[in-house]
Amino acid sequence: MGSVLVDLQIATENIEGLPTEEQIVQWATGAVQPEGNEVEMTVRIVDEAESHELNLTYRGKDRPTNVLSFPFECPDEVELPLLGDLVICRQVVEREAAEQEKPLMAHWAHMVVHGCLHLLGYDHIEDDEAEEMESLETQIMQGLGFDDPYLAEK
């Protein structure tokens, strides 16, 4: 199995309590499970203002969100090992973890896994897509040593 090369960008004032680059690489590799060569992606950890602006610009949602995924798109004849970019909002992840009574690092891992699956083309708009994606997220999270992230909802 290959690995995921992560360009980690920290764009938040408070860096205390953030996951390490090694953790993010481990979680992304667990989600992507690249075969052969490395694949590359960017993970940008931001504050609410940047998340809000990006969510409004690209999704028409007037609020910050936990994770945004921007898959890399290139012509079919061009083969580059680029997955795309994840933008994760520190404050939203921390708030959700507290509200859902989940360990903070487990929720960070879930957001990386969830975002990576979006980069791979998975979605959760339709119920059947959501079930497939949630099932895959659960398998990946358990493979990484975490509990089912949807346990409280079941």
UniProtKB/Swiss-Prot annotation:
Give the location in the cell: Cytoplasm
User: Which keywords does the record carry?
Assistant: Cytoplasm, Endonuclease, Hydrolase, Metal-binding, Nuclease, Ribosome biogenesis, rRNA processing, Zinc
Organism of origin is Haemophilus influenzae (strain PittGG)
Q: What does this protein need as cofactor? A: Zn(2+)
Q: Which domain of life, per UniProt?
A: Bacteria
A GO molecular function annotation here is: zinc ion binding
Cellular component GO terms held in the UniProt record:
cytoplasm
- What phylogenetic lineage does the species belong to? Bacteria, Pseudomonadati, Pseudomonadota, Gammaproteobacteria, Pasteurellales
Q: What is this protein called?
A: Endoribonuclease YbeY
